[in-house]
Amino acid sequence: MLSEAEEPREVATDVFNSKNLAVQAQKKILGKMVSKSIATTLIDDTSSEVLDELYRVTKEYTQNKKEAERVIKNLIKTVIKLAVLHRNNQFNQDELALMEKFKKKVHQLAMTVVSFHQVEYTFDRNVLSRLLNECRELLHEIIQRHLTAKSHGRVNNVFDHFSDCDFLAALYNPFGKFKPHLQKLCDGINKMLDEENI
């Protein structure tokens, strides 16, 4: 038989667990609502066009609709999670410094993507692949404390695809079937650069 001192503790534990479950359920519901509102503010028309074009070129390159959807969904989820962490002041000073470095690296990547398209005979797939992998490493460092192994896997899925030298060579082939996709991608990225969204 339980002593009187043990009974209230057991009851308090039951109450705590129930409240904890309720709070978790609320967070999950709120999280979905917040994610949707953040997604619409983060992904403007230009970003959406770039993502759509990335999807089309990925689908055509891989010949696999599900794989293309997975890569783009993982990209969107990663961007949204990063934005949620940043907007909720979850990063420490070191992570904020890494975030600034990451933003500069992404800007450099965007400028390089466009430059390689605009200036003939400058394309170097190894340069683009290296820049993409540098972005990947910075991103892993930034989210290390905050996100799960599954999220790190999503990051790898996105960067494994886009940093693949064969994919980049096919995308930038001046006589290849992806030339129209590259033009649309660069138009969108140029617009994002002009609007200082990247």
Curated annotation (Swiss-Prot):
GO biological process assignments: apoptotic process; defense response to Gram-positive bacterium; positive regulation of apoptotic process
Coiled-coil blocks: 49-83
Subcellular location: Cytoplasm
Gene Ontology molecular function, alphabetical: cysteine-type endopeptidase inhibitor activity involved in apoptotic process; molecular sequestering activity; small molecule binding
Any one GO CC term of the record: cytoplasm
Pfam families linked: DUF758
Keyword line: Apoptosis, Coiled coil, Cytoplasm
Main location: cytoplasm
Similarity annotation: Belongs to the TNFAIP8 family.
Task performed by this protein: Acts as a negative mediator of apoptosis. Suppresses the TNF-mediated apoptosis by inhibiting caspase-8 activity but not the processing of procaspase-8, subsequently resulting in inhibition of BID cleavage and caspase-3 activation.
Protein name: Tumor necrosis factor alpha-induced protein 8
Organism: Mus musculus (Mouse)
